[in-house]
Amino acid sequence: PFLAPEYYRKYVFANYKKLFAPLHDCGKKILYTSDGNYSAFIDDVTACGVNGFVMEPATDMAYIAEKYGKTHVFVGNADTSILLSGGREAIEAEVRRCMDVGRRCPGFVMAVGNHIPANTPVENCLIYNEIYEKLARR
């Protein structure tokens, strides 16, 4: 975290509840995203009323899936650095890691955990899709 956890709890999350209230009142769903690893704050974020999480690779997807995978949506969190510079085996291992965690959770959406760099080889993206399609079949 960029700031001490106590600061987030005192100033940030208290305001999130206020910020989210009108959205909840209108029946809207809220997906939370943040740069970096917010695993330590997942209970605080959830208490603010979010309905799901979009995660970067630094966030512990397995931990979040264990705690909230049956009740919340979560999106992520394949590492784009592997997509950028990894070979077929590394890409397959990364997609498999995400799918092995996510397939137990009804609200899982497989996605990369950050932006795909412009210089990512197209072939690597095709490998990612091929492996995902193979593993996504139930």
Predicted regions and their residues:
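Active-site loop segments of alpha/beta catalytic cores
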Residues: 1-138
